[in-house]
Amino acid sequence: MDSKKAILMLSLLAMALISSVMSARDLTETSTDAKKEVVEKTNEVNDAKYGGGYNHGGGYNGGGYNHGGGYNHGGGGYHNGGGGYNHGGGGYNGGGGHGGHGGGGYNGGGGHGGHGGGGYNGGGGHGGHGGAESVAVQTEEKTNEVNDAKYGGGSNYNDGRGGYNHGGGGYNHGGGGHGGHGGHGGHGGHGGHGAVQTEDNTQN
């Protein structure tokens, strides 16, 4: 009789132990799912604020094909790429960015902060040379490529504005100030935001 009671007690204890283990596992999975959901919701909010995906892409560490951006290492893409606070921008047309090492790309580099800009046409930078106005001017393009590599682009080519701390630049009214990138023809695009720069009238 005592052995039956002992077996019954052991069975009940085993069932209780199994039940508690399963409950703990369920709680852990629920907690993990809840954390994932919070992260996803946060990412959705940040995507809504800063962009994400192929068009207007970005997010915190984003990119995307068109109008990319984001906070850290953001941006890139083929058209109007770039932006982001650190290491932002690039892309084929209209780079940019705010913070260190911003901008770049083929048309209209730029950036705000140290080592901004570059690119083939309308690169950013202070005191370099803007992109060539015509593809036919081969020697000037080569000179500009060298100067882009040395200075990150430049100022005062068809009203292109010189940058401050390697920002802005370009030709045909491109860039300027802290941030804005050059742009190839027309008015330069819009790069990262920065402090207002006192314009140097000697460059105009």
Curated annotation (Swiss-Prot):
The keyword Repeat applies. Induction: By cold stress, abscisic acid (ABA) and water stress. Pfam families: GRP (PF07172). Residues 54-176 are annotated as: 7 X 6 AA repeats of Y-N-H-G-G-G. Sequence repeats lie at residues 54-59, 65-70, 71-76, 78-83, 85-90, 98-100, 101-103, 112-114, 115-117, 126-128, 129-131, 164-169, 171-176, 178-180, 181-183, 184-186, 187-189, 190-192. Residues 169-204 are annotated as: Disordered. Keywords: Repeat, Stress response. The keyword Repeat applies. Residues 169-194 have a biased composition (Gly residues). It comes from the Eukaryota. Residues 98-192 are annotated as: 11 X 3 AA repeats of H-G-G. Belongs to the GRP family. May be involved in resistance of the plant to environmental stress. This is Cold and drought-regulated protein CORA. It comes from Medicago sativa. The lineage of its organism: Eukaryota, Viridiplantae, Streptophyta, Embryophyta, Tracheophyta.
